[in-house]
Amino acid sequence: MRNLMIAFALTFAVACNNQTETQEETAHDDGSTHVMEADTRTAMSTDPDFTIESAAHQQLLRDFYTAYINLKEGLVAADNQRTDRAAKEMRTIITDASFNELEGEAHDHIAQMGRDVIRMVEHSDVEEQRNYLNSLSTSLFTMLKAGDIQTEAYLQHCPMAFDNQGAYWVSDKEEIRNPYYGDRMLKCGSVRETL
């Protein structure tokens, strides 16, 4: 029995992994929930095992990032027309033949971004589009790091999104403007990484 108790205690200690968070989170509970689908990247790494050196690919990445920022701001404002326009622009960029020449992990991220963007185009409702933002954002941030595109990018995190599972987005400004909750919880989140 004693061995069983020790084994249980060790298992519990390892499972809990008592890590402390270094960033301060600003969180507010407004009672609303989001349904998370098609995205399981809550614990992720944005460290690429590749680089994007081609000037043409870097320009496509800059263009995609600009359209992404428009999408993100549309989600913050809950503006369906703005998010639809941005998602369609992102789809045009992501399907560029030269962008899809990338191989390995870079190709995997481009493919994931493409799937997320296509889903956003298919679902013009802002709430539906938010379901694909986390996956899109983590892949985009990895690509931005690999591309070294010389622009500011902040990986930000909302701990409250999707029933407290948390979710990421990328911003061109350090200021928190939460695209998952918009004006309901505009300042909920923290900067996790900066380029």
Spell out what each predicted region is.
Residues 1-14:
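Sec-dependent bacterial lipoprotein signal peptides
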Residues 16-20:
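Bacterial signal peptide processing site
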Residues 24-52:
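Post-signal peptide N-terminal segment of mature Sec-exported envelope proteins
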Residues 45-49, 53-195:
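Mature extracytoplasmic or organellar-lumen-exposed domains after removal of signal/transit peptides
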